[in-house]
């Protein structure tokens, strides 16, 4: 706690330019939507290493207690997220954690901006995290029925790695990281659309197999 408090003056002296801050928030919000605990722990470690100048309002992320708790939960999630079916329950519950926390981080990170800019950043952070989380959940829902567990594990490992990589990469190349997120959001939009269509076709096929007539369309 004393060490973290001592970091506050140092972090307050070094600030990211507004545009770079927004770019970092875009990348970290997406990362939080994939894996919140890995993202928060990585942010805290990068700040303590002097790689990322966090705003004074986010110095709480540099507390060793916060880093330790997030790292411990990440370790639990690392295994829980790779169990077919259970991962869907885990991700469903985290809809109410990842998105609000990502929005809160964006809100506190932009405390020095105008109220309207802060509100816009908060909403953007929440929406980006929701898009990443929604895309992850949709793909998992499509993969879970598969009899082999390897695809689920590979997806989970990829998501964990991407969350950590994006968080770090945003500190080195914020604009490139934000551009990557933009591309990923477009891919997610197409993936979600494909998953929804596939699930509809699956349900229609199941209805036909069971001999349940679908209601006529008008």
PLM region spans:
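Mid-bilayer segments of alpha-helical transmembrane spans in multi-pass integral membrane proteins
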Residues: 100-109, 118-138, 161
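The first (N-terminal) embedded transmembrane alpha-helix
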Residues: 21-46
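A cytosolic-side transmembrane-helix exit/cap motif
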Residues: 58-65, 110-119, 137-148, 197-209
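Generic transmembrane alpha-helix signature in multi-pass membrane proteins
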Residues: 27, 104-110, 136-143, 156, ...
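Cytoplasmic-side transmembrane-helix entry/capping segments in multi-pass membrane proteins
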Residues: 63, 87-100, 120-122, 147, ...
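C-terminal ends of transmembrane helices
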Residues: 75-88, 135-144
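Helix-coil boundary and interhelical linker segments in multi-pass alpha-helical membrane proteins
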Residues: 2-20, 47-64, 105-121, 169-179
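Small-residue-rich segments of transmembrane alpha-helices in multi-pass membrane proteins
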Residues: 95-107, 151-165, 211-217
């Amino acid at each position: 706690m004393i060490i973290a408090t001592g970091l506050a003056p140092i972090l307050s002296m070094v600030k990211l330019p507004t545009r770079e801050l927004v770019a970092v928030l875009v990348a970290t919000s997406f990362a939080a939507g994939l894996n919140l605990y890995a993202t928060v722990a990585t942010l805290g470690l990068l700040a303590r290493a002097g790689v990322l100048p966090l705003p004074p309002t986010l110095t709480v992320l540099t507390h060793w207690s916060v880093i330790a708790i997030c790292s411990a939960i990440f370790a639990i999630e690392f295994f829980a997220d790779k169990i077919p079916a259970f991962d869907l329950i885990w991700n469903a519950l985290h809809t109410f954690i990842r998105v609000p926390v990502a929005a809160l981080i964006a809100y506190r990170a932009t405390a020095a901006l105008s109220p309207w800019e802060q509100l816009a950043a908060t909403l953007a952070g929440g929406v980006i995290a929701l898009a990443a989380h929604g895309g992850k959940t949709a793909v998992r829902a499509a993969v879970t029925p598969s009899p082999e567990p390897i695809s689920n594990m590979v997806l989970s490992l990829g998501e964990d790695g991407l969350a950590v990589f994006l968080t770090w990469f945003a500190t080195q190349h914020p604009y490139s990281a934000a551009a990557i997120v933009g591309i990923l959001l477009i891919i997610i939009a197409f993936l979600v659309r494909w998953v929804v269509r596939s699930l509809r076709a699956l349900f229609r096929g199941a209805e036909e197999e069971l001999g349940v007539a679908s209601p006529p369309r008008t």
